[in-house]
């Protein structure tokens, strides 16, 4: 089953025309610049905004249908909502906030949720005594305790400083693995998408510009305007293949005939991971180097060549290199290098990636 969102609405100068299908049991990220319409989209799903026309359904459960006259009120849609700010009741304890609005007592589920988010020690405290990260964990738990069919999260880390973001992120990763509830996650952070999402939809000016599996959208032309020169990268779903105990490196299998040595990753062999390789950390050679400090030298074929203009006379060339069937690596080189190597689509080359260039910030456990 899927989540179907189709509606038209005019708000201010933005004409929304949304037609979006999202998977039922995954984290789907909505990405785009501020004012693109991401929050409006989830407010329509929740019932906080009523569109002029359209249809919204979670599987067979219809929330809104303008033709049939269906418009369930917010409290009957079985949707949990986590806002940018926690919106806790200041005069209630944490436990009081968690139980507010809970219709059926379920001690086992309460224990499971509070354990998952590590907030049991906070139950007797009041919001004024909590850190920003603790407040957001309580807000997430409150949303889960309503036993929703869908969880909406509107930039839940946006108001937190970096230490608090690092505090909350592991709990969000746990959600994707342990909670069997579809999550629609609004963000403008590529790092959060890398760590959390399985599906990605890009929203711009009230329209869905592209939507699909994260790896496919990440590699598409639709992502290029959102990535700076240093952000251009390839995203891989791989598995830990082996560890090199002497040199603190881990070999990651990207495809049957393609592996990378990267800085050591904690995990057992066969652990599925997601790996980001920045395009400006990849170089190209026409012949296999015989003596080099670079640990990864991979045979490849030039798949595509594109010019990239970053403005202010900054020009670069993005080269897509095929490492194996369905496995592609982006390399960013200068126009000078392109001319000097005389690269053409179909050329056999070698991709070089430093083992130290892929660090912990580029690695995440693959969401299930």
Curated annotation (Swiss-Prot):
PANTHER family membership: ABC TRANSPORTER I FAMILY MEMBER 10
Pfam families in the record: ABC_tran (PF00005), TOBE (PF03459)
Domain Mop: 291-362
E.C. number: 7.3.2.5
UniProt xrefs under PROSITE patterns: ABC_TRANSPORTER_1, ABC_TRANSPORTER_2, MODC, MOP
Organism: Vibrio parahaemolyticus serotype O3:K6 (strain RIMD 2210633)
Subunit details: The complex is composed of two ATP-binding proteins (ModC), two transmembrane proteins (ModB) and a solute-binding protein (ModA).
Protein name in the entry: Molybdenum import ATP-binding protein ModC
The protein's role, per its UniProt record: Part of the ABC transporter complex ModABC involved in molybdenum import. Responsible for energy coupling to the transport system.
Catalysis performed (reactions): molybdate(out) + ATP + H2O = molybdate(in) + ADP + phosphate + H(+)
UniProt: ATP binding residues: 32-39
Keywords (A to Z) from UniProt: ATP-binding, Cell inner membrane, Cell membrane, Membrane, Molybdenum, Nucleotide-binding, Translocase, Transport
Its membrane topology: Peripheral membrane protein
GO MF term set: ABC-type molybdate transporter activity; ATP binding; ATP hydrolysis activity
EC primary class: translocase
UniProt superkingdom: Bacteria
Localization, UniProt: Cell inner membrane
Keyword ATP-binding (UniProt): yes
Signal peptide: none
All residue ranges annotated as the ABC transporter domain in the record: 1-230
Family: Belongs to the ABC transporter superfamily. Molybdate importer (TC 3.A.1.8) family.
């Amino acid at each position: 089953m899927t989540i179907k969102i189709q509606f038209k609405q005019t708000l201010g100068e933005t004409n929304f025309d949304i037609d979006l299908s999202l998977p039922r049991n995954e984290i789907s990220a909505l990405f785009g610049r501020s004012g693109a319409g991401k929050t409006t989209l989830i407010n329509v799903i929740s019932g906080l905004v009523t569109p002029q026309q359209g249809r919204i359904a979670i599987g067979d459960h219809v929330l809104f249908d303008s033709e049939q006259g269906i418009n369930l009120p917010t409290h009957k849609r079985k949707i949990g909502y986590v806002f940018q700010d926690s919106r806790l009741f200041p005069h209630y304890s944490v436990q009081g906030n968690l139980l507010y609005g809970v219709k059926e007592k379920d001690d086992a589920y309460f224990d499971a949720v509070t354990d998952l988010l590590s907030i049991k020690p906070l139950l007797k405290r009041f919001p004024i005594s909590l850190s920003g990260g603790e407040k957001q964990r309580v807000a997430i738990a409150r949303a889960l305790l309503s036993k929703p069919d869908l969880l909406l999260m509107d930039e839940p880390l946006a108001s937190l400083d970096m230490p608090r973001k690092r505090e909350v992120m592991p709990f969000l990763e746990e959600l994707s693995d342990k909670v069997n509830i579809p999550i629609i996650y609004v963000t403008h952070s590529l790092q959060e998408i890398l760590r959390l999402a399985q599906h990605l939809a890009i929203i711009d000016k009230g329209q869905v510009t592209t939507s699909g599996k994260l790896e496919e959208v990440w590699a598409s032309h639709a992502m290029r305007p959102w990535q700076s020169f240093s952000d251009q990268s390839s995203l891989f779903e791989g598995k830990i293949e082996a560890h090199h105990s002497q040199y603190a490196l881990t070999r990651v299998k990207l495809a049957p005939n393609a592996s990378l040595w990267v800085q050591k990753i904690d995990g057992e062999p066969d652990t599925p991971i997601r790996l980001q390789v920045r395009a400006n950390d990849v170089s190209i050679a026409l012949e296999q180097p015989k003596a080099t400090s670079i640990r990864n030298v991979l045979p490849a074929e030039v798949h595509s060549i594109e010019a990239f203009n970053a403005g202010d006379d900054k020009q670069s060339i993005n080269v897509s290199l095929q490492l194996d069937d369905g496995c592609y690596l982006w390399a960013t080189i200068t126009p000078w290098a392109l001319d000097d190597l005389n690269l053409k689509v179909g050329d056999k080359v070698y991709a070089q990636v430093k083992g130290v260039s892929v660090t912990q910030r580029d690695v995440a456990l693959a969401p299930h």
